[in-house]
């Protein structure tokens, strides 16, 4: 008995010491200030400053944000299609109830490993030259949650084009939108299927081609200098999609909600229902992210960006979130990035939204679904 008590004390002491160390790390970043001169840097000067003044992540010139746009800041920052990254007062009135669950939260979690049957979780899409991140973050997480709710039986890709072009309450299409409004639209109006431009599958595939975002020459054409105009809302499927009509192809949500701006609340929701849409503030240095755990180090604020949260972990004592971006697979860590967790870095823990698929609609589809996959590596 004494031995067990002694061992228990050791475990508790180790746990407390670990938490104390973690808090001291977080305090360092929570209370930091960005040097005023660093905040004004851009281009090679900013990249050099980032790489010389911290060791959590590396910066590298990204072709899309340098040679393509150059000084056209309006076009460059137009890709950041979220005006307000934090949940509004109204958005906080309807929060996920998973925050009240009694769950053991692991040190690390990855949706790709937890739900291996769901191919959509692994997919990186490309928003091209359109400020449609708010729509991509939404349909990506919705697609994942449909698969998870159906225990891997329904593998679908919801259409970013359908949401982007037809949700008038969401905002301004390629000029930005509201993530929570996108999830509410899913509940009220439903969203049809639609793959990326290259795969060209589903009812409404994405209308804009992938383009070169990156630091080295790729097989994609350079991104257009200006943003694409918002597509016209077409409430019909493309001509070569004959599986279902537009209305028959829709998937609906049962609920849409915000998630409390608390690390454990976010983790519980992610563990329970799957990937989430999150928004955060993008600074100039983030555009040049090439790997590691991102912390804002320099450069000016450009705008708000929406992405898909899939997990978390710790790297050499630094806690992070794992996130899927929509700038293709050659950006960052194969299209993903990691960002400091626990200090609301760039507001990333203050604008988390999600929802639940409408289960009765999923059940009826399971009886006639043929497991048609619409994923393609050629994004």
UniProtKB/Swiss-Prot annotation:
Annotated keywords: Disulfide bond, Glycoprotein, Hydrolase, Protease, Signal, Thiol protease, Zymogen
CDD domains: Peptidase_C1A_CathepsinB
GO terms classed as biological process: proteolysis involved in protein catabolic process
Glycan-linked positions: 196, 201
GO molecular function, one term: cysteine-type endopeptidase activity
UniProt cross-references to SUPFAM superfamilies, sorted A to Z: Cysteine proteinases
PANTHER family: CYSTEINE PROTEASE FAMILY C1-RELATED (PTHR12411)
Family: Belongs to the peptidase C1 family.
Protein's UniProt name: Cathepsin B-like cysteine proteinase 6
């Amino acid at each position: 008995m004494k031995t067990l008590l002694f061992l228990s004390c050791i475990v508790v002491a180790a746990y407390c010491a670990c938490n104390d160390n973690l808090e001291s790390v977080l305090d360092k970043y929570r209370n930091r200030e960005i040097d005023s001169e660093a905040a004004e840097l851009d281009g090679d000067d900013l990249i050099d400053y980032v790489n010389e003044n911290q060791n959590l992540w590396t910066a590298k010139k990204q072709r899309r944000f340098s040679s393509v746009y150059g000084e056209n800041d309006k076009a460059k920052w137009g890709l950041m299609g979220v005006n307000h990254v934090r949940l509004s007062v109204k958005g906080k009135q309807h929060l996920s109830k998973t925050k009240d669950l009694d769950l053991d939260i692991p040190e690390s979690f990855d949706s790709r490993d937890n739900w291996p049957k769901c191919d959509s979780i692994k997919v990186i899409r490309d928003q091209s030259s359109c400020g449609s991140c708010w729509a991509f973050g939404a349909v990506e997480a919705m697609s994942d949650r449909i698969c998870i709710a159906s225990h891997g039986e329904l593998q679908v890709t919801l259409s970013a084009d359908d949401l982007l072009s037809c949700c008038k309450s969401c905002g301004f299409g390629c000029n930005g939108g509201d993530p929570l409004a996108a999830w509410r639209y899913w509940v009220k109006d439903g969203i049809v299927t639609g793959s990326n431009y290259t795969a060209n599958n589903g009812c409404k595939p994405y209308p804009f081609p992938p383009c070169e975002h990156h630091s080295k020459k790729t097989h994609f054409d350079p991104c257009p200098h200006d943003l694409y105009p918002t597509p016209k809302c077409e409430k019909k499927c493309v001509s070569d999609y004959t599986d279902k009509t537009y209305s028959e192809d829709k998937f609906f949500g049962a609920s849409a909600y915000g998630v409390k701006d608390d690390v454990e609340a976010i983790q519980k929701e992610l563990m329970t229902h799957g990937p989430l849409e999150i928004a955060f503030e993008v600074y100039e240095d983030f555009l040049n992210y090439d790997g590691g755990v991102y912390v804002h180090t320099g450069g000016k604020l450009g705008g708000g960006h929406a992405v898909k949260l899939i997990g978390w972990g710790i790297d050499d004592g630094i806690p992070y979130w794992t996130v899927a971006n929509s700038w293709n697979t050659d950006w960052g860590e194969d299209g993903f990035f990691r960002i400091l967790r626990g200090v609301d870095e760039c507001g990333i823990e203050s604008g988390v939204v999600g929802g639940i698929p409408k289960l009765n609609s999923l059940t009826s589809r399971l009886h006639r679904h043929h497991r048609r996959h619409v994923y393609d590596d050629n994004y």
